[in-house]
Amino acid sequence: MPVAALIREEIEIPANVNVEINGNTVAVKSGAKELKRDLLYPGIEISTEDGKVVIECTFPRKAQTAIVGTYRSHIQNMIKGVTDGFEYKLVIRYAHFPMKVSAKGNTVMIDNFLGEKYTRTAKIMDGVTVKVSGEEVIVSGANKEFVGQTAANIEQATKVKGRDTRIFQDGIYIVEKAGKVL
């Protein structure tokens, strides 16, 4: 089976975005938003030339081919994060006991879930903002992974255990992630 001698992926850098590569660290900056990420894998080179980020690998193996595509996606997400940002929408659902959800500091507090006396909490990751308005929770930020993890933390905090989930459907659920309706 023929083997590619070179894999090369190019990513266009928008006019208002600055990309710096220092060793293995890729830094993407636009205005006040900045994201940094270490991208290190043997045989893979990342550089900038002519307004593009170039990811190259000579005589790649199967794993290196996959990592080149992964790095391309990471850098594209970083560029999109500093320009547009990412937003997840969650919806609060309850049948009998009305939940009270609030965001303070780096935690989301959920009171009166299924009539419980104690407060359930979920961690908010760095650089992520959470807004609660009525029956909707909006999680937004520049780092796609941190926004997704914060939304997952909120959803997991209201997971029903020890009861039939077909009957007890109370909770906070992700209904839209990064523009895709679920």
Swiss-Prot record:
PROSITE patterns: RIBOSOMAL_L6_2 (PS00700). InterPro entries: Ribosomal_uL6-like (IPR000702), Ribosomal_uL6-like_a/b-dom_sf (IPR036789), Ribosomal_uL6_a/b-dom (IPR020040), Ribosomal_uL6_arc (IPR019907), Ribosomal_uL6_CS2 (IPR002359). Keywords: Ribonucleoprotein, Ribosomal protein, RNA-binding, rRNA-binding. Signal peptide: none annotated. One of its GO terms (molecular function) is rRNA binding. GO terms for cellular component: cytosolic large ribosomal subunit. GO terms for biological process: cytoplasmic translation. Part of the 50S ribosomal subunit. This protein binds to the 23S rRNA, and is important in its secondary structure. It is located near the subunit interface in the base of the L7/L12 stalk, and near the tRNA binding site of the peptidyltransferase center. Belongs to the universal ribosomal protein uL6 family. This is Large ribosomal subunit protein uL6. It comes from Methanococcus maripaludis (strain C6 / ATCC BAA-1332). The gene is rpl6.
